[in-house]
Amino acid sequence: MDAFASFFHSINKKSQQKYYALIPDILNILPPLKETSNSDDLTKALLAMVDLAEAAPKMFRPLFHDLVTFSITVIQDKELDDQARQNALELMATFADQNPQMCRKDPSYTSEMVTQCLSLMTDVGIDDDDAEEWNASEDVSRDPLYFAS
């Protein structure tokens, strides 16, 4: 995938359109990487997809909804490394930046993006410095200091 992204960037815009037909085959690489929980390779593949989406987001138009659906499943999969999940979110954000019209037309893009962003914001990982302390703390909203007399 990296090789295709590098090659794609090296050719002129007019020639790039000839390679749009390869996108379905390229996207077919992603599901097996996710199914085998191969986070490192999935992370690299998603970064290559981000590069391609920055260069020519319109080439993804025919399969955009499928790509959104796949990316959402990656973001939701807590068995994958955080980096892979974040790269899937970055891919979706790249489309919003590069081709907002395409995102607007997709029936699930906006609601799923908002939901997944909020979900990722609430994830507390094992390696978070304050996670253990935060989980053990009392609810401050019940503390009398926070109530007005």
Identify the function of each model-found stretch.
Residues 1-149:
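Karyopherin-beta/Importin-beta family HEAT-repeat alpha-solenoid scaffold
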